Amino acid sequence: RDLADAKLRDVLSMGRSQLTQSNFSEDWEGKSNGGGVPVNSELEYQVIKDNACPMLVRTYSGTKDVPGLARIHERALNISWHALSFWWFDELDGRGNNTLLENLREHFEAVRYIVTTGKPVEPNVPHHFAFRGADDITYIVSGFLAAKAIKNMGANHMILQNMLNTPKYTWGVQDLAKGRAMIKLV
């Protein structure tokens, strides 16, 4: 409440569980659930939003029906911005059942919907490449391609995520150079 009284914003960034990402609104009986917040209904999202108030709320998309989840996140959370993985959380990394092409189609459909809401889009793509050992050029190019795709679909606002010290074997100056190059291109 102190932040709100000072006219400042804070964000609840909800790291949802694997089952929330892959099996939202399905029966979870007997399924193991990795770490994160286990949310399985719009009502649970609404309770989180209400309890987080006056903070803004945001979360990542899921591994299937990405456009449907974007709509649910709008309705139930009034999500501050939408974070999408584009290339990831599919057959490519084993965290979802979509092929890469199906995943991109779902994400692009979701972006087209998000554009109608006027909310920003965050392509949390580059750091996923870095987590998987990609070089800095791949990191930068993936961020550029995601930004270009979002812009071409009509988004007016994008949140560019730039994680430092990823992967572990880099050091600060390299990360800053990588980040500055990506910002310059985007």
Predicted regions mapped to residue ranges:
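Catalytic alpha/beta active-site cores
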Residues: 1-147, 151-153, 157, 161
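Short acidic, glycine/proline-rich loop/turn micro-motifs
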Residues: 25-26, 170-172
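Short glycine/threonine-rich loop-to-helix capping motif typified by GTGT followed
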Residues: 138, 171-178
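Acidic/histidine-rich catalytic neighborhood
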Residues: 166
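Conserved, mostly hydrophobic/aromatic
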Residues: 186
